[in-house]
C-alpha cells in the first residue's frame, strides 16, 4: 500500500498537503480508523477537481478523472473512476449542459477554385502530415466573433488560431501564418492542408500563402462534416467544454481566454483518440496512435487505429 498508509511519512504528508495548500493538521482532521488516508485525501481530490472545473467548466468527467488520477495515484488512495464521478456528483461538480444558437460560418457559393479531397481515408502516421482547418463562432458581450483553428490531424494539437470580429479571410490567414511559423520549408513541402470549401480557404490570398510554402491543398467535396471530422471535433470540444459555459465580455477578453484554453487543450487535456495522451505528447511521436474507444461496427477484439 502507499507510503502514506504504511509509514505515515511526515515528508510524504508535507509534500502532498503542501502541494494543494493544506496543512498536516488539516489532513489528520479527516482521519477515520484504518481508512484515514482515503478519507483525508478525498477533500484534497474534490478541491483540485473544483479548481479544474472552475477553469474548464465543460471538461468531461472521464477526462477530469485521468488528470486528477495522474496527480494522486502515487498516494495509493485514488478512488476508481465510478467513485470519483460520484464524488463530483455529490459536490455539484458535474458538467452543466447548455444549448446555444448556431451561426453560419461557411459560404461555399463563390467563384474561387475548389480543390479535390486528398485526405479521404488517409490515416496520418506523423505530425505535420495533415493539417485541418475550420472556423467557429464565439458569443461575447460585444456580439459574435469568430475563431479560426488549424489542428494537426495526427496529434490533434492546435497549431494555429486567431480570433476576429468578422469572417474576413485575414483571420484564418493569421491562424495559418501562426501554424506555418512552427515548421520549416521542408516539412511544409510534405504537408497537406485540408479544409471545407468556404470562401476564406479558397480565396486568392489564402491559397497563395499555402503555395508559397509548397503546402498541398485539400478540400471537402460536400457539406458532410465527416469530411472534416477532426477539425469539427476540435471546434466542438472548445465550444462545449469551455465557451458555452463562459460569459465573455469583449473580443479582447476572448483572445485572452482562447490563449489559456488552447494551452490547456494542447498540454493537459487527455484525448481518447490518441491513447489518452495530450496533443503535445503525441506531437512528438510517430506511428499509429491507439484510440481508446470503439465505433459500433468495430469487433470487440479488433485492434483500432487512430480516429
Where are these regions (language model features)?
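Mobile genetic element proteins and their domesticated derivatives, centered on retroelements
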Residues: 16-17, 27, 49, 64, ...
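Mobile-element integrase/transposase regions
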Residues: 78-149, 173-178, 182-183, 188-190, ...
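C-terminal domain-tail junction helix/linker
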Residues: 211-215, 237-307
Amino acid at each position: 500500500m502507499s507510503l502514506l498508509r504504511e509509514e505515515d511519512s511526515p515528508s510524504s504528508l508535507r509534500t502532498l498537503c503542501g502541494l494543494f495548500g493544506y496543512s498536516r493538521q488539516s489532513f489528520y482532521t479527516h482521519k477515520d480508523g484504518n481508512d484515514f488516508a482515503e478519507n483525508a485525501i478525498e477533500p484534497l481530490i474534490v478541491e483540485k477537481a473544483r479548481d479544474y472545473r472552475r477553469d474548464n467548466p465543460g471538461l468531461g468527467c472521464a477526462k477530469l478523472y485521468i488528470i486528477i488520477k495522474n496527480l494522486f495515484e502515487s498516494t495509493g488512495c485514488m478512488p476508481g473512476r465510478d467513485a470519483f464521478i460520484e464524488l463530483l456528483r455529490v459536490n455539484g461538480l458535474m458538467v452543466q449542459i447548455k444549448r446555444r444558437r448556431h451561426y453560419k460560418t461557411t459560404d461555399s457559393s463563390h467563384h474561387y477554385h475548389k480543390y479535390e479531397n486528398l485526405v479521404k481515408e488517409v490515416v496520418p502516421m506523423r505530425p505535420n502530415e495533415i493539417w485541418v482547418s475550420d472556423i467557429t463562432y464565439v458569443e461575447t458581450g460585444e456580439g459574435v466573433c469568430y475563431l479560426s483553428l488549424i489542428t494537426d490531424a495526427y496529434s490533434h494539437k492546435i497549431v494555429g488560431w486567431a480570433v476576429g470580429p468578422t469572417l474576413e479571410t485575414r483571420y484564418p490567414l493569421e491562424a495559418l501564418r501562426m501554424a506555418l511559423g512552427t515548421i520549416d520549408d521542408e516539412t511544409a513541402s510534405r504537408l497537406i492542408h485540408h479544409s471545407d470549401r468556404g470562401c476564406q480557404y479558397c480565396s486568392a490570398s489564402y491559397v497563395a500563402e499555402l503555395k508559397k510554402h509548397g503546402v498541398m491543398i485539400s478540400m471537402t467535396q460536400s457539406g458532410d462534416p465527416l469530411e472534416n471530422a477532426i477539425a469539427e471535433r476540435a471546434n466542438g470540444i472548445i465550444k462545449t467544454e469551455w465557451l458555452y459555459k463562459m460569459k465573455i465580455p469583449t473580443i479582447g477578453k476572448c483572445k485572452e481566454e482562447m490563449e489559456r484554453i488552447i494551452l490547456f487543450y494542447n498540454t493537459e487535456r487527455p484525448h481518447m483518440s490518441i491513447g489518452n495522451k495530450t496533443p503535445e505528447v503525441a506531437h512528438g511521436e510517430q506511428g499509429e496512435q491507439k484510440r481508446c474507444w470503439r465505433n459500433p461496427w468495430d469487433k470487440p477484439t479488433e485492434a483500432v487505429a487512430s480516429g
